[in-house]
Amino acid sequence: MTTAQMNDPERDGSAAVGIPVDRTVRLHATDASVLDACCGSRMFWFDRADSRAVFVDRRRERHTLPDVSSKGGSRELVIDPDHLADFTDLPFATDTFALVVFDPPHFERNGATGWVGLKYGTLKGDWQEMLRLGFAECFRVLRPEGVLIFKWCEDEIPVSRILALTQHKPLFGHKSGKQQKTHWITFMKPNVLVTGPPKAGPVEWRVRPHGEQRGNL
């Protein structure tokens, strides 16, 4: 197997994992209404160059993978996001997108080595905290009443453990795959404001009046 890193000097890669984004200096402006927060090779997209979406991943690389079903016995895996960034620290303003797709790595053991890890990524270290931060960031950049589509495969970790990492309540979902292990779950960001300091007495919720300036949720 050969591996070649894809280097593009015109693209900003300093927001890779472990390097915090300074949003006061470097926020990416976008006209896209859809965010794929960890796009990988964009496997489930009908149009992998859809102009309505912006694609983010922490990796930019190319791999040649063995594939007996392909002509020549191999195929190319290309991970080439629009922005190189980590989903725990997204370089976009609050309330930017109408729809966010969140499909994080789901393998902790089986994908640690080999082509599975290259294709899907792997969970490392304190992955529960990583996913908790990922949910929080995806909801931050999502507009009020915007939709978040979350995808998770239960090959190793039950989806119930993952849903416990966000305070947001899912609307509905669907199972897919031969063994019905892949979950597609839909959330909607509430159109509310929270007033008062966190953990300082009861939290007051109120509906945001139509046309009112958006704030951080």
What are these regions (language model features)?
Residues M1-L217:
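Class I S-adenosyl-L-methionine-dependent methyltransferase catalytic core
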